Amino acid sequence: MKRNTIDIITLGCSKNLVDSEKLMRQLEANGYKVTHDSDKPQGEIAVINTCGFIGDAKEESINMILEFCQAKEEGKLKKLYVMGCLSERYLKELALEIPQVDKFYGKFNWNELLADLGKAYKSEFAIERTLTTPHHYAYLKISEGCDRKCSYCAIPIITGRHISRPMEEIIDEVKLLVSEGVKEFQIIAQELTYYGVDLYKSQKLPELIERIANVPGVEWIRLHYAYPAHFPEELFRVMREHDNVCKYMDIALQHISDNMLNKMRRHVSKAETYELIEKFRREVPGIHLRTTLMVGHPGETEEDFEELKEFVKKVRFDRMGAFAYSEEEGTFAAKEYEDSISHEVKQQRLDELMALQQEIAGELSQTKIGKEFKVIIDRKEGDYYIGRTQFDSPEVDPEVLIKADEEYLKIGEFYKVKITAADDFDLYASIL
């Protein structure tokens, strides 16, 4: 057990990771040594940043808390604190059920931890973070919360209404990160396309992205978690005109059947969804689309599911994730619908959909053989350097593998490569 050392454990999404990075910077500014995502306690104090989005995430968070409680009981840890979405939603219940935790914080009051440690929040470091990602890329969170009322989603209950960060503050953070060596920015929010409506009374995402693109040193900008309804089409122009805005869009569509879109309260139709996809591909040639789909929402019939599969076959998404509906208390779906589709049927539909996408992804990968791409090198792993094209986001998308014996490559640098082979997920390349 190392004195004056604090372990930060982050569960859940990249938005949580940004919160952890901000906390880490504040702790370091107060004289602590900080470790991140250690397998076991390293220091006297541990802070677990939890996720509470769906059942599996909640279970993972609870198990991690209990694991560290056990370490505390064994004398391997002096203090244990918990923050994040799970404790934001269930703070009182958790405090009663797991008294071994010294204190639970919500998602937005983690700065109180500093006071409880006898330290102070340092406002001069408000936009600074200790990056846990490789030094050349960072996640950039532009807003908190969500004003959408999708039937199945607990995020608005947990995080509250949409709050945009001031544009100047975001630009200042970008400039600071660039000065520290960051070249690539993953722009994240619960709902990107709503950015600016609360602060500036209109959608400001295109203006924000254009301003980030104009910051010297920004090489790649990638957009995550857009919403299909009321999409700001000015963004198409920004993506066309700025080479450093990746031709990539992560837009969660969830379903295609009008029956399901209505039950999910998505405020977009099947026809509008197809029209938006066609616009993306017409206005931004070569764009790669990533989406997320859901199966097993209450009311999903076999006909709805077949319609969803046909949609996937027809559109042929470059990247796709899917998950089975999980009933979340407090949501519209939990109040109004019976969770009548069995776990077995949900899993069967999920497996079918992902098998279909794997086949499509494999076919799309084969079309890249012989083509040339610019890649950034993330790391060296065994006999390969691992890189990504502009069409690949870290952690979730395919990677480009380059034989390490070919030549020495620098982590965080860009190289031109030629694709020589492909499998269902990854590409293999040689340096040009």
From Swiss-Prot:
Q: What class of enzyme is it?
A: transferase
One of the GO BP terms on file = tRNA modification
MF-aspect GO terms: 4 iron, 4 sulfur cluster binding; aspartic acid methylthiotransferase activity; metal ion binding; protein methylthiotransferase activity
Identify the domain of life: Bacteria
What are the binding positions for [4Fe-4S] cluster 1 in this chain?
C13, C51, C85
Q: Please state every residue range assigned to the domain named Radical SAM core.
A: 132-363
Q: How is the cofactor bound?
A: Binds 2 [4Fe-4S] clusters. One cluster is coordinated with 3 cysteines and an exchangeable S-adenosyl-L-methionine.
Pfam families, sorted: Radical_SAM, TRAM_2, UPF0004
What's its catalytic activity?
A: L-aspartate(89)-[ribosomal protein uS12]-hydrogen + (sulfur carrier)-SH + AH2 + 2 S-adenosyl-L-methionine = 3-methylsulfanyl-L-aspartate(89)-[ribosomal protein uS12]-hydrogen + (sulfur carrier)-H + 5'-deoxyadenosine + L-methionine + A + S-adenosyl-L-homocysteine + 2 H(+)
Q: Where in the cell is it found?
A: Cytoplasm
InterPro entries in the record = Elp3/MiaA/NifB-like_rSAM (IPR006638), Methylthiotransferase (IPR005839), Methylthiotransferase_CS (IPR020612), Methylthiotransferase_N (IPR013848), Methylthiotransferase_N_sf (IPR038135), NA-bd_OB-fold (IPR012340), Ribosomal_uS12_MeSTrfase_RimO (IPR005840), rSAM (IPR007197)
The cofactor required is: [4Fe-4S] cluster
Q: Which UniProt keywords apply?
A: 4Fe-4S, Cytoplasm, Iron, Iron-sulfur, Metal-binding, S-adenosyl-L-methionine, Transferase
Q: Give start and end of each TRAM domain.
A: 366-432
Domain MTTase N-terminal, chain residue ranges per copy: 4-122
Which residues does the record give as [4Fe-4S] cluster 2 binding sites? C146, C150, C153
Family matches, as NCBIfam families: 30S ribosomal protein S12 methylthiotransferase RimO, MiaB/RimO family radical SAM methylthiotransferase
**HAMAP family per the UniProt record, alphabetical:** MTTase_RimO
Entry's family note: Belongs to the methylthiotransferase family. RimO subfamily.
| Function, in words | Catalyzes the methylthiolation of an aspartic acid residue of ribosomal protein uS12.
Quote the protein name from its UniProt record. Answer: Ribosomal protein uS12 methylthiotransferase RimO
